[in-house]
Regions:
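Boundary/entry segment of secreted carbohydrate-active catalytic domains
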Residues: 1-12
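A short, acidic, flexible beta-alpha connecting loop/helix-capping segment that sits on the rim
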Residues: 10, 284-293
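Glycine-rich, proline-tolerant flexible connector loops at the mouths of alpha/beta enzymes
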Residues: 32-57, 113-119
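Acidic/histidine-rich catalytic cores of soluble enzymes
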Residues: 2, 29-30, 36, 72, ...
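Conserved, mostly hydrophobic/aromatic
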Residues: 5, 22, 30, 62, ...
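Active-site acidic/histidine proton-transfer and metal-coordination neighborhood
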Residues: 16-17, 21, 56-64, 68, ...
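A structural motif
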Residues: 27, 67, 100, 105, ...
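C-terminal helical cap(s) of enzyme catalytic domains, especially alpha/beta-barrels
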Residues: 294-317
């Protein structure tokens, strides 16, 4: 396994400075932001797609720093009911897939997106319950008319270029748990899989280790981010919490640096399960911790994971 980082947290640094800092911190890889919600802080993706020389130079810059690119990330909502937003997010997704092919990266990360409740909707509508029946009808319409047709088309577009699409199971979007991830994969193709981020699963009451096992063969990329559950607030209000992330004292849960939500034993079990299932790729740190600075959160995550990830190939079992 290798250790990397999702580079959004270093958006204020230049590409060269960011790469230098990542290498000096002991990382092996970077996950490059390719538009939509993460932005494009280190590379103007549309410009790179238009120029093979520019794309080659970008890749060479990363490699010269002693790093590799684990994935291109364009987390967005190409199914947004606002046509302008959907068009922009779709274009950024397509550009990320094209650039990935050009620079020899085989994973592009996204969200599944979430449509509205009809073709006349203005805002996404994330369904969390089956009744009244309106909600079941909305969910069925979203999947049958929007989610599956769109991603079946995009899965083919990516497959034709040798690219795998890794979806982050994230509340607010149609793929948010194990069964919705599997439904998308089964409906659209084997190059559809997961960017596995356990933080979004904890507060839903899921066991990430059980989810990992169910997704064997469909884990394309991994995020290292934790989630701290506030027991008092959860017992009072439950976990469907729409308060601002900055309202830490009142929220039922918050994202946090690895080790600050779940201890070493969970993360040791997590990387062990990944290896059992055949994943030996990059573990990419994602910093979203409202209680720490970028540098402190990143530094603590690197130190924590360095002692946990498995970096060497397992030895032959001479005892078996």
């Amino acid at each position: 396994m290798k250790l990397g980082v999702m580079t959004a947290l270093f958006g204020s640094r230049s590409l060269e400075d960011m790469l230098k800092h990542c290498k000096a911190s002991g990382l092996d890889a970077v996950e490059i932001c390719a538009g939509n919600y993460p932005g494009m802080p280190h590379a103007k993706i549309p410009e790179l797609v238009k120029s093979a020389d520019a794309a080659k130079k970008f890749k060479a810059t990363v490699e010269k720093a002693g790093l590799e690119i684990s994935a291109l990330s364009c987390h967005g909502n190409p199914l947004h009911p606002d046509a302008a937003i959907a068009k922009e997010h779709h274009a950024n997704h397509r550009n990320a897939v094209e650039l990935a092919k050009m620079i020899g990266v085989d994973v592009v990360i996204n969200f599944s997106g979430c449509p509205g409740d009809s073709d006349t909707a203005k805002h996404p509508n994330w369904v969390t319950c089956p009744w009244p029946d309106d909600f079941s009808k909305i969910r069925d319409w979203q999947w049958e008319k929007k989610v599956i047709p769109y991603w079946k088309q995009e899965a083919k577009f990516a497959a034709d270029r040798g690219i795998r699409l890794a979806f982050e199971m994230h509340p607010g979007f149609c793929v948010y748990n194990t069964e919705t991830m599997l439904r998308l994969r089964e409906s659209c193709g084997d190059n559809i899989g997961a960017n596995f981020d356990p933080s979004h699963l904890f507060w839903q009451g899921m066991d990430p280790l059980v989810s990992l096992r169910a997704l064997k063969g469909a884990i394309f990329h991994v995020h290292a981010k934790d989630c701290r559950i506030d027991t008092q607030n959860t017992l009072k209000n439950g976990t469907l919490d729409a308060k601002p992330y900055g309202d830490v004292v009142n929220r039922s849960w918050v994202s946090c640096t690895v080790g600050y939500g779940h201890g070493e034993q969970f993360w040791r079990d997590f990387v062990s399960e990944l290896r059992v299932l055949g994943y030996d790729g990059v573990i990419s740190i994602e910093h979203e911790d409202g209680l720490m600075s970028v540098d402190e959160g990143f530094g603590k995550a690197v130190a924590f994971l360095k002692n946990i990830i498995l970096t060497e190939k397992p030895a032959a079992m001479w005892w078996a």
